[in-house]
């Protein structure tokens, strides 16, 4: 039953109405993105593997303000990647893509909002250098393309 619900949530074209469904949907997207980028690296995706090979030990994260259970991360170190759920606890992430609300996160994750406009408006906060936000954003799009 849980897998069926997750499947229907991830294939939805409109954001859900109920707050608990929004929370679940954003969590599923965050887990899909972190795991997807890691799996593309492990399976030899040329662009992502090159990026991971050159990377020092860094953590990239996704989070929503005031939603401590809605977060995920990917650790990248010398060609290896590891996706994780929740907040990375050993150190502050090198870069965090943080959203001001579940609705803002869904706007970006479902492709109905503009990343630059949301950044200007404060709905998307990039903790770290913006060029890394663009890079992670491009990898998010790759995972999204494969997922569809």
Positions of PLM-derived features:
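Feature captures hydrophobic
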Residues: 1-148
